[in-house]
């Protein structure tokens, strides 16, 4: 006889698989594979080597996803049979438990593959923070978010490198960019881009009044050297300045820091962590490429959302999450509507559930 806890676990796994089915439309994926296979059969397909490799990899990834999905369907069929047999044969209970463990592991693996299957999802991430208007209040909020993301990275055993750090006038930060290195760092963080809002009793207000602060987050993938993104040198304004801020003995105090402004978009990238001006410029150009890619990525997603009539709530330029610390505690994602009252845990880096909800939500728009 199957124990109650096992039955609950079976029901949960079935529910999880149904959720995955809603996101992973196998008919649509199989149709996409047919289109890619047809394209790969064209006589001129390999004329553009980079594009051909990208399409071949995409087709293979989709085929692997289909195989994994069908194997999971077979596993659930085996589970149903084992559960039925266990009603008359108690020795089959062990078989049910064994199949359950296999399914649990496969669902976790498939979910990760499905949700993190876009180009560059497996890349390292650059994460930039900028406070909104409001001086010290917003600058302090930006530093709280920086702490939240570094705590999250530590919990996931990711490496963290400070690329640029500009201290606030009284507290907090004027801006900061960090590099988070590890498996799927960009894929997990990419939907954290946007405006984050804080409501609290200000520690900087002698009258103890409630304040609202804003800070924006930008997340970009780190590209390898052969990714081609055209940048016209005439579109760049390059300034040098003296390094400073966090970093101690590892920050070069000469005029080696570099600030690059991309004139057509107004994007500004500052780097001060490398040992020479040449190295800082190279890193700044790499981050600029990543920001230009992310800008295009956001435009494409906004267009998909606009076609579904949802851009008002989910626009990249709008507020994405609110953190209320007074008069009650609540952190709420305004796109997925996922929320928790444990605001302190979130600010201590416990954001995995928010990230998973984001990935599931945006998977519908792939």
UniProtKB/Swiss-Prot annotation:
A GO cellular-component term linked to this record: cytoplasm
PTM-bearing positions, type N5-methylglutamine: 249
Keywords (A to Z) from UniProt: Cytoplasm, Methylation, Protein biosynthesis
A GO molecular function held by the record: translation release factor activity, codon specific
PROSITE patterns: RF_PROK_I (PS00745)
Family: Belongs to the prokaryotic/mitochondrial release factor family.
Protein's job: Peptide chain release factor 2 directs the termination of translation in response to the peptide chain termination codons UGA and UAA.
Stated name of the protein: Peptide chain release factor 2
Organism encoding this protein: Petrotoga mobilis (strain DSM 10674 / SJ95)
